């Protein structure tokens, strides 16, 4: 990479950090190419991304962002997992770490808040924004459905009574 490419990469990475709801830093030393590809595909399916960058360039890209506090995590072979949804990157990273001992989560950030390894694991156990939205819509729509059922119940009862009288009249 020449200077111009590095500058462009740092600008791109800085923008990615700014747009991210959460950033996770992990060691990946010893993972095979197929394991890395598996991690990348799982992360992209969930709506996040994985980036391997030189530590020096990542530290420069973090300057001026809310995630600047995690600069100290960048040592050794590190990768960056990030997503706009604050829950996606931690959830995928923690799930992947459960099955791959060589993938070690170092920490991360959510906005201006630095996250320890335990905080990342706790964050991963929360439902995603889409799951929360679905639950909220369900909670809002359930009372409306019940009100509609209560309002329609008397009309349904009247129809059944009239139907019963009609059946009686035919039988007689």
From Swiss-Prot:
Keywords for the protein's UniProt record, in alphabetical order: Ribonucleoprotein, Ribosomal protein, RNA-binding, rRNA-binding
Keyword RNA-binding attributed = yes
Q: Which domain of life is it from?
A: Bacteria
Mind telling me which GO cellular component terms the entry cites? large ribosomal subunit
Single biological process term from Gene Ontology:
translation
UniProt-recorded Gene Ontology molecular function terms: large ribosomal subunit rRNA binding; structural constituent of ribosome
- Pfam families, A to Z: Ribosomal_L10
The family database entries (PROSITE patterns) matched by this protein are listed as: RIBOSOMAL_L10 (PS01109)
The record's listing under InterPro entries reads: Ribosomal_uL10 (IPR001790), Ribosomal_uL10-like_sf (IPR043141), Ribosomal_uL10_bac (IPR022973), Ribosomal_uL10_bac_type (IPR047865), Ribosomal_uL10_CS_bac (IPR002363)
Cross-referenced PANTHER family, in alphabetical order?
39S RIBOSOMAL PROTEIN L10, MITOCHONDRIAL
Subunit (UniProt): Part of the ribosomal stalk of the 50S ribosomal subunit. The N-terminus interacts with L11 and the large rRNA to form the base of the stalk. The C-terminus forms an elongated spine to which L12 dimers bind in a sequential fashion forming a multimeric L10(L12)X complex.
What this protein is reported to do is described as: Forms part of the ribosomal stalk, playing a central role in the interaction of the ribosome with GTP-bound translation factors.
Q: Which NCBIfam families match?
A: PRK00099.1-1 (NF000955)
Question: Which family, according to UniProt?
Answer: Belongs to the universal ribosomal protein uL10 family.
- Protein known as: Large ribosomal subunit protein uL10
Q: Which organism is it from?
A: Bartonella henselae (strain ATCC 49882 / DSM 28221 / CCUG 30454 / Houston 1)
């Amino acid at each position: 990479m020449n200077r111009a490419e590095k500058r462009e990469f740092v600008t791109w990475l800085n923008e990615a950090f700014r747009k991210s709801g959460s950033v996770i830093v992990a060691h990946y030393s010893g993972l095979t190419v197929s394991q890395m590809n598996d991690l990348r595909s799982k992360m992209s399916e969930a709506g996040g991304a994985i980036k391997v960058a030189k530590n020096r360039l990542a530290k420069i890209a973090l300057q001026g962002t809310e995630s600047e506090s995690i600069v100290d995590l960048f040592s050794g072979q590190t990768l960056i997992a990030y997503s706009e949804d604050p829950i996606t990157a931690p959830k995928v990273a923690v799930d992947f770490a459960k099955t791959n001992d060589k993938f070690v989560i170092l920490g991360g950030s959510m906005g201006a808040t630095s996250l320890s390894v335990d905080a990342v694991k706790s964050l991963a156990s929360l439902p995603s924004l889409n799951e929360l939205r679905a639950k909220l819509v369900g909670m809002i729509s359930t009372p409306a459905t019940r009100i509609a059922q209560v309002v329609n119940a008397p009309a349904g009862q009247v129809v059944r009574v009239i139907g019963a009288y009609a059946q009686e009249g035919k039988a007689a």
